[in-house]
């Protein structure tokens, strides 16, 4: 039987990158997915690809609590529950030393990652049945502290704290809460960060980052999605308050 047979999954940031790769894998494993994001055209394209029998979408900026509440309600009205929640929306912020970092960008980066994840959990948890799974996409930077990306690092560490509290609160209902920590992953999102960090063209920037990874290469979105599947499925029935790194050894 498919590992997510008849499961309903909400994924924020589901229109591209890791979120879309996760949606594809989950649908192939028997799930129905409700995708939430800010790009309506990409969301519609994702639903068309996955099939309307298997997917739906809603537009919301996760920093807007009312918008999140509406997006969650739309999915709950259609499916009745969310067996799995993947809080995956994110932005990269600036690349600059702390003394030069724009305060408004710092605040926005924390808002998307931390306040956004809080909004998603706050409004989805009432629709998660006992024994469900909540996954927050953190980052390898939620385990280490590279220079130049202070807002992103702070936000990704903060998500771990939110996860740990939620895991304790929801344990009596056997709802598991975990973070996943991708290392550099081959997506346009990562390409942009690397080019700004290195001031190199994309291919050269990627090689510079490959050199930081003990296993010598970027992960693919599909490899991160496999980690998502583990945390979403019954295979991880006794895994909660855990930080799952898929980073080629970068955080080791």
Where are these regions (language model features)?
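Residue(s) in the substrate-gating loop at a strand-loop-helix junction
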Residues: 139
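Substrate-binding pocket helix/loop in short-chain dehydrogenase/reductase
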Residues: 96-98, 102-107, 209
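Active-site helix of classical SDR
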Residues: 121, 155, 163
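Short, small/polar-rich loop/turn modules that mediate ligand/substrate recognition or access, typified
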Residues: 171, 176, 239-241
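Short C-terminal tail/terminal secondary-structure segment
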Residues: 92-95, 217, 228-229, 236, ...
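Conserved glycine-rich cofactor-binding loop
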Residues: 15-16
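The beta1-alpha1 cofactor-binding region of Rossmann-like NAD(H)/NADP(H)-dependent oxidoreductases
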Residues: 40, 59-71, 103, 222
């Amino acid at each position: 039987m498919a590992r997510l047979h008849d499961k309903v999954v909400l994924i924020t940031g589901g229109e591209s990158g890791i979120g879309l790769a996760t949606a594809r894998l989950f649908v192939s494993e028997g799930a129905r997915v409700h995708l939430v994001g800010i790009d309506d055209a990409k969301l519609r394209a994702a639903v068309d690809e996955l099939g309307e029998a298997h997917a739906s979408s809603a537009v919301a900026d996760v920093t807007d609590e009312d918008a999140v509440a509406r997006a969650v309600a739309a999915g709950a009205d259609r499916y009745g529950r969310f067996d799995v929640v993947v809080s995956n929306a994110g932005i990269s912020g600036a690349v600059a030393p702390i003394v030069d970092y724009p305060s408004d960008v710092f605040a926005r980066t924390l808002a998307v990652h931390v306040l956004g994840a809080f909004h998603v959990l706050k409004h989805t948890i009432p629709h998660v049945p006992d024994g469900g799974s909540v996954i927050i996409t953190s980052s390898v930077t939620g385990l280490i502290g590279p220079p130049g990306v202070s807002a992103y690092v702070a936000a990704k560490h903060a998500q771990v704290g939110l996860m740990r509290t939620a895991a304790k609160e929801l344990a009596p209902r056997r709802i598991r809460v975990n973070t996943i920590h991708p290392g550099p992953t081959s997506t346009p999102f990562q390409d942009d960060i690397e080019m700004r960090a290195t001031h190199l063209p994309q291919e050269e920037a990627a090689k510079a980052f490959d050199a930081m990874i003990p296993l010598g290469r970027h992960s693919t979105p599909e490899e991160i999605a496999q980690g998502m599947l583990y945390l979403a499925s019954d295979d991880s029935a006794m895994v909660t308050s855990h930080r799952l790194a898929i980073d080629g050894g970068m955080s080791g």
